Amino acid sequence: GELVAPEEFKRRGALTLLKILLVQNRRPLSGDALMETLWPGAEPRAARNRLHVLVHSLRQAVEPPSRHRSWTYVCTRDGGYYLDATPSQYLDIEEFRSSIALGARAEKQGDYTRAATTYQTAIDLYRGDLFQGDPYAQWCWWEREHLRETVLDTLRRLSGLAAANGDWET
């Protein structure tokens, strides 16, 4: 994939839509849920039209040029929209979640060295609150808080693993 600069989005809302779909972790989000998230209380017909315009704008910014109507990244399934990032595209939030899960699995299996290594990978990926440029956005509040709590829990786990190993300097 190629880097898409924020100024390439013709509509600011398209960038917000991309962010919303990113945190969904490839799970479809219904059009109704997106409309309520983006325009709470808006008249449904107008909101649906606005959503279609935003989806089109987002696709123009991130989809490869194609004559076909099959979408590569911004897809629909079960009446919802989702972002289908391929394995060749790196998403730090997915890597973070994966590292936490791998660390927990290793810890549960008693492989404390591997657990500590993968937990540390996750900690290194966390560079601050999710979408810092949108500090008051309600649509990402829960995920932002969840990631922050996950980091704090992971730091506690790391320190516990280090203490159990007699490593008081980590």
Residue map of PLM features:
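Intrinsically disordered, low-complexity protein-interaction/activation regions
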Residues: G1-T170
